[in-house]
């Protein structure tokens, strides 16, 4: 994996630490995964949870991203998704499956 994904790897590390075994998979997608990001592009990161995400889960994921924003100036856009939905035929999930980079 290219070293320029280190911010995404750090986000994954923090998410796993905060979610106590509920993380099934973390995938970078969007412009950073495709390799066509600009310097100010955000980091689109899908967090697949073993159960249904709650509003508190989204708050926690956002807080972890905000911490990295303050530390690095880079914005993480988290997307919590139940892992049972990974194979669904939606535009977002098809994009994650086709262009995503598992972390």
Name what the model sees in each region.
Residues 31:
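Conserved H-loop
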């Amino acid at each position: 994996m290219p070293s320029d994904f280190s911010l995404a790897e750090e986000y994954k590390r923090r998410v796993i630490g905060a979610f106590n075994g509920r993380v099934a998979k973390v995938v970078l997608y969007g412009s950073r995964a495709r390799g066509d990001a600009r310097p100010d592009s955000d980091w689109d990161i899908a967090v697949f949870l073993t159960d249904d995400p709650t509003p508190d889960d989204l708050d926690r994921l956002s807080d972890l991203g905000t911490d990295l924003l303050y530390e690095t100036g880079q914005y993480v856009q988290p997307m919590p998704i139940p892992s049972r939905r990974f194979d669904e035929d939606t535009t977002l999930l098809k994009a994650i499956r086709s262009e995503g980079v598992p972390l």
